[in-house]
Swiss-Prot record:
Gene this protein is translated from: Ido1
UniProt record, GO biological process: 'de novo' NAD biosynthetic process from L-tryptophan; inflammatory response; kynurenic acid biosynthetic process; L-tryptophan catabolic process to kynurenine; multicellular organismal response to stress; negative regulation of activated T cell proliferation; negative regulation of interleukin-10 production; negative regulation of T cell apoptotic process
Protein name as catalogued: Indoleamine 2,3-dioxygenase 1
PANTHER family hit by this protein: INDOLEAMINE 2,3-DIOXYGENASE (PTHR28657), INDOLEAMINE 2,3-DIOXYGENASE 1 (PTHR28657:SF2)
Broadest EC class assigned to this enzyme: oxidoreductase
Pfam families, A to Z: IDO
The organism's place on the tree of life at top rank: Eukaryota
Family label: Belongs to the indoleamine 2,3-dioxygenase family.
Length: 407
């Protein structure tokens, strides 16, 4: 990160502006739009009616009737993000439909061409990612009201009642709760650069406090998301076509590529904030083919480019961990370890969430039907295509190893 002689407050302002990080909602898109220009009204109408169209067996017919639209009229980042979100929802619904074995391997030209055009403009993949369904998929019911679950809603929905509302909004609120940590980063960098252990200790304590708040909000997932509905309904619509035996070759985007392409579904690994803190604290995950580090690096391609650039800038920042080790200051070590323990605690809780929402339901019969005939190793994969329990254990264990101690 650039570290000239500027105040932490000015440094924070510059970072927020340069890397598209909002003062209030962090990496989330501030004030997402809800409407597209009239030309694109057909997309919005389909995206807003997905559950009903799927239930009536009309979804694919309606998608195939959509006009082939170009994207030139979609000017401005927030307008493009709304269109990308809508097309992402439609794409997932078209591919998975009722969530059974009736899967489409080809995305029709009238959807694939504009979707890929928008994806190229935004620097995002043509699949519903975390940047879409969590970071850009929200609104306040009362615009002047608070940023609380009760005053918020999502813009589009899949089948499964309010399951996706709970899943996406709690994930968003975790992001927002943890976002003050980003504001502390300029102070962290400045403190290391200027050899100021007291300033660094204070900044690290503020990061630890934001992680504690994020975990408390994460616990609300159990209040709003039903495990059976998540596993047997919502999880299917969030699944990608990489590492997925249902689409082993990937998805063909008609009119764009001549061969199928593989993309991962939305994953918490695509969250910029927790990868940012790993980099800031010098936490190194296991490397090698199929490793946690490889997966997390790949997930950066699913982040908005400005957020990817922010992560890259952190990698060239003054090394916090090395500074703490060299100072041998007990208070500084404790503040650093509080941050690491905050990440460990969040990742341990994430493991318990995965056990509740993926592992246990995979061993039970669904609400109104037979248990899936997919093998359990498939059922236990996350929407990003990983063996989610092994991945999270690896990330949690390597985070824990970053704790500092000395005689």
């Amino acid at each position: 990160m650039p570290h000239s002689q500027i105040s932490p407050a000015e440094g924070s302002r510059r970072i927020l502006e340069e890397y598209h990080i909002d003062e209030d909602v962090g990496f989330a898109l501030p004030h997402p739009l809800e409407e597209l220009p009239d030309t694109y009204r057909p997309w919005i109408l389909v995206a807003r009616n997905l559950p009903k169209l799927i239930e009536n067996g009309k979804l694919r017919e309606e998608v195939e009737k959509l006009p082939t639209l170009r994207t030139e009229e979609l000017r401005g980042h927030r307008l493009q993000r709304l269109a990308h979100l809508a097309l992402g929802y439609i794409t997932m619904a078209y591919v998975w439909n009722r969530g059974d074995d009736d899967i489409r391997k080809v995305l029709p030209r009238n959807l694939a061409v504009p979707y890929c055009e928008l994806s190229e403009k935004l620097g995002l993949p043509p699949i519903l990612s975390y940047a879409d369904c969590v970071l850009a998929n929200w609104k306040k019911k009362d615009p002047n009201g608070p940023m609380t679950y009760e005053n918020m809603d999502i813009l589009f929905s899949f089948p499964g009642g309010d399951c996706d509302k709970g899943f996406f909004l709690v994930s968003l609120m975790v992001e927002i709760a943890a976002s003050p940590a980003i504001k502390a980063i300029p102070t962290v960098s400045s403190a290391v650069e200027h050899q100021d252990p007291k300033a660094l200790e204070k900044a690290l304590c503020s990061i630890a406090a934001s992680l504690e708040k994020a975990k408390e909000i994460f616990k609300r997932m159990r209040d709003f998301v039903d495990p059976d509905t998540f596993f047997h309904v919502l999880r299917i619509y969030l699944s990608g076509w990489k590492g997925n035996p249902k689409l082993p070759e990937g998805l063909l985007y008609e009119g764009v590529w001549d061969t199928p392409k593989k993309f991962s579904g939305g994953s918490a690994g695509q969250s910029s904030i927790f990868q940012s803190l790993d980099v800031l604290l010098g936490i190194k995950h296991d490397v090698g083919e199929g490793s946690a580090a490889e997966f997390l690096q790949e997930m950066r391609e699913y982040m908005p480019p400005a957020h990817r650039n922010f992560l890259s800038s952190l990698e060239s920042a003054p090394p916090v961990r090395e500074f703490v080790i060299l100072r041998r200051n007990e208070d500084l070590k404790e503040a650093y370890n509080e941050c690491v323990n905050g990440l460990v605690s969040l990742r341990m809780f994430h493991l318990s969430i995965v056990d509740t929402y993926i592992v246990k339901p995979s061993k039970q019969k669904p609400m109104g039907g037979h248990k899936s005939e997919e093998p359990s190793n498939t059922e236990n994969r996350g929407t990003g295509g990983t063996d989610v329990m092994n991945f999270l254990r690896s990330v949690k264990d390597t985070t824990k190893k970053a704790l500092l101690s000395w005689p």
